A protein has these predicted regions:
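AAA+ ATPase active-site-proximal loops
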Residues: 20-170
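N-terminal accessory segments that target, anchor, or regulate ATP-driven/P-loop NTPase machines
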Residues: 1-21, 61
Length: 170
């Protein structure tokens, strides 16, 4: 009985090492994503596929389902991973400040704008910009967002100078 227990223990140790190695291989590619179901493997395959393109990506899901983790995995597997991914929660920002935060502003563009400020699109140049809760963005900002997506250019608040940007929007 003792030999059988010892043999089973050794088998469990070997199996544990193999599974740990398998998890580490997945973790190195996908960071903090821990789901191991068939559905999750399907999602991760899609992440690998879309990461190699520069396409804009829309991630849908309920609060707490890991949209930011998927966005980070897409960024980390992309050619843009040498630069930090910029994040912004559109629902947490008051509507009046959202435009300034996204596109930046010039000194004097509005009361309290005492200096020039770079927006998230400039900060994310040659990288990825993750807009969490993008559906909460005010309708009046959507044409400006569309211009960035289509033309890769925008203007800071208080300026008419076009700024070129190379951003992948997630």
């Amino acid at each position: 009985a003792y030999q059988e227990i010892h043999r089973l223990k050794e088998r469990l140790v070997d199996e544990n090492l193999a599974l740990t190695e398998q998890l580490n291989n997945v973790d190195s590619e996908f960071g903090e994503i821990i789901g191991r179901s068939d559905a999750m493997y399907s999602v991760l395959k899609q992440v690998e596929m879309v990461a190699q393109s520069d396409s804009t990506v829309l991630i849908l899901g309920e609060t707490g389902t890991g949209k930011e983790l998927i966005a980070r995995a897409i960024h980390n597997l992309s050619n843009r991973n040498s630069r930090r991914m910029v994040k912004m929660n559109c629902a947490a920002m008051p509507a009046g400040l959202l435009e300034s935060d996204l596109f930046g502003h010039e000194r004097g563009a509005f009361t309290g704008a005492s200096s020039q400020r770079l927006g998230r699109f400039e900060l994310a140049d040659k990288s990825s910009l993750f807009l969490d809760e993008v559906g909460d963005m005010p309708l009046e900002l959507q044409p400006k967002l569309l211009r960035v997506l289509q033309e890769q250019e925008f203007e800071r608040l208080g300026s008419n100078k076009l700024i070129q940007t190379d951003v992948r929007l997630i």
